[in-house]
Amino acid sequence: MTEAKNPRSLVGTVVSNLMDKSIVVNVERRIQHPLYKKYIRRSKKFHAHDAENICHIGDIVKIEECRPLSKTKSWRLVSVLAEGVIEGDNA
């Protein structure tokens, strides 16, 4: 068995971290409408493995494709690029 040579990687925003060692990442992309040529935002949610539970809601993260870890998880957390701001925290 060999590892994937170039696994796909995506950058997105953490929208849920309620599960143990799992996060949900929302990835946005822009596509051009085939007829009207207007750019439209499309988004998709990916379940990713967060082994150390370090992510918080609002964080910008990089995820990478891996072998299936569960029924819905086949991505893993690579790094946290930027930490999200917690609203209502005026300390």
From Swiss-Prot:
Keyword line: Ribonucleoprotein, Ribosomal protein, RNA-binding, rRNA-binding
One of the protein's GO biological processes: translation
Q: Name one GO molecular function term.
A: rRNA binding
Gene3D superfamilies assigned to the protein according to its UniProt record, in alphabetical order: Nucleic acid-binding proteins
- Keyword Iron-sulfur among record annotations: no
Q: Which SUPFAM superfamilies match?
A: Nucleic acid-binding proteins
Q: Which GO terms describe its cellular component?
A: cytosolic small ribosomal subunit
What do we know about how this protein assembles, alone or with others?
Part of the 30S ribosomal subunit.
Its biological purpose is as follows: One of the primary rRNA binding proteins, it binds specifically to the 5'-end of 16S ribosomal RNA.
Its family? Answer: Belongs to the universal ribosomal protein uS17 family.
Name-wise, this protein is Small ribosomal subunit protein uS17
Q: Which organism is the protein's source?
A: Acidithiobacillus ferrooxidans (strain ATCC 23270 / DSM 14882 / CIP 104768 / NCIMB 8455) (Ferrobacillus ferrooxidans (strain ATCC 23270))
